[in-house]
UniProtKB/Swiss-Prot annotation:
Matching Pfam families: Globin (PF00042)
Keyword Phosphoprotein attached: no
Protein name (record): Myoglobin
Domain Globin as annotated: residue spans: 2-148
InterPro entries assigned: Globin, Globin-like_sf, Myoglobin
Gene3D superfamilies: 6.10.140.2100, 6.10.140.2110
Presence of the UniProt keyword Transferase in the record: no
Residues at which heme b binds: H94
Endpoints of the signal sequence: none
GO biological process: removal of superoxide radicals
Gene designation: MB
Length: 154
């Protein structure tokens, strides 16, 4: 299920636009995730007190975590599927410490695509969206495989 060179080019081109404002994109993605799927907030002990959109919007901690999430995802995407070394420690913490189910990775993937489409509609057409979907699916599948190695069936 690898991506073609052209698909990776689509992914990395749009990711360059995301990187131009990691804080804004990351904050928006997490706010949208927690708003649209409130059960995901239960996995984040430090954010449980953020119950309103205004609280989420004002949270520097949430913004900072959004940068962390997108920075890590960007590193993985730039490896174009050759991400074993980068993915393993991420999968280990998500499986053994945070216990984040794979379905939550699906949820955030959908939100990432929605937010990029809203913020960069002119640059994120059908081909780019399909390529990003495929890249995020590759990431999720590889995370799920690693989860099993760590004994987490999430």
């Amino acid at each position: 299920m690898g991506l073609s060179d052209q698909e990776w080019q689509h992914v990395l081109t749009i990711w360059g636009k995301v990187e131009s404002d990691l804080a804004g994109h990351g904050h928006e993605i997490l706010m949208r995730l927690f708003h649209d799927l409130p059960e995901t907030l239960d996995r984040f002990e430090r954010f449980k007190g953020l119950t309103t959109p205004d609280q989420m919007k004002a949270s520097e901690e949430l913004k900072k975590h959004g940068v962390t999430v997108l920075t890590q995802l960007g590193k993985i995407l730039k490896l174009k599927g050759k991400h074993e070394a980068e993915l393993k420690p991420l999968a280990q913490t998500h499986a053994t410490k945070h216990k984040i189910p794979v379905k939550y990775l699906e949820f955030i993937s959908e939100v990432i695509i929605k937010v990029i489409a809203e913020k960069h509609s002119a640059d994120f057409g059908a081909d780019s969206q399909a390529a990003m979907k495929k890249a995020l699916e590759l990431f999720r599948n590889d995370m799920a495989s690693k989860y099993k190695e760590f004994g987490f069936q999430g």
